[in-house]
Amino acid sequence: MEIERLDEADAVAVDREQADNHGVAPPETRDQQAYRTEYRVTVEAAYTWDAAALELRQAWEAHETKWPSPEDADRDGDRSLNPEANAEVERGCGHIREIAENVITPAMRAIESEDSDRHLIGLEHCLKGMDRIKEKIADAVRYKGRAPEEALETLKDVVRFTFCYSEERYTSGVIEDCQRLLDRGFQPFDRLNSWQAEQYKGVNSRWRDPESGLLFEVQFHTRASFEAKQLTHAAYERLRDPATSDVERDELQEFQRKASAEIPIPPNVSDIEDYSPEQRRG
């Protein structure tokens, strides 16, 4: 969504229209002042990030030229599942899809409708693709010795939702939406505030549907932090690849640090507290 820079001349014109017969503009209300401040902060943050994002995209293109991505077959080896495991995973994914479509997604859309100042993004991708799920499960079977069913249960982001806020509304919005999730009966599993991290910024949380037991992820982003996540996703995937050289790994980490450093920080974001399984048991 493109945001136009506030034009001072337009603001003055509006004030003139509101002036009384003596040419004196009425004083702004507290809500008007807050809106104007919020608008300025949002616009300036957008322009700051947009300029940085352009440079970061160019930097990533240069990285890909220097470090061409190896062919999937050379990089990944055999990531296929045997027929029995494949059928088991497909059955499990079908069950997850049914719960996501009939229970969790309607609840998330209802939560979204309670506040027009933010919205869900990427809803069409809230379910991870079947091929990608199978790749992750094959890795878990191959490298961690897990059974396919166990590997499917431990995947963090098979079902994922993302809320996007303005910088000014971010902190209060996240806190309010977490309460809305609780009010809908979802059980908090964990929450991590990564706004002070070097290579990723945002808040990631997981929740459990009490009836089915299904875990799903809810991420909370600003436009800039979400776009940075998308922009650095390929770097993240290469960092997870054991075949990536140490030299390239250093460059990838530096690229992620640069992207993260350009993201405007929402006010009072430290008020969003972490939540751990240990706290849940306590």
What does each of the following model-derived ranges do?
Residues 2-154, 242-246, 260-282:
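Charge-rich, low-complexity segments
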Residues 145-282:
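Long beta-strand-rich cores associated with HINT superfamily self-processing modules
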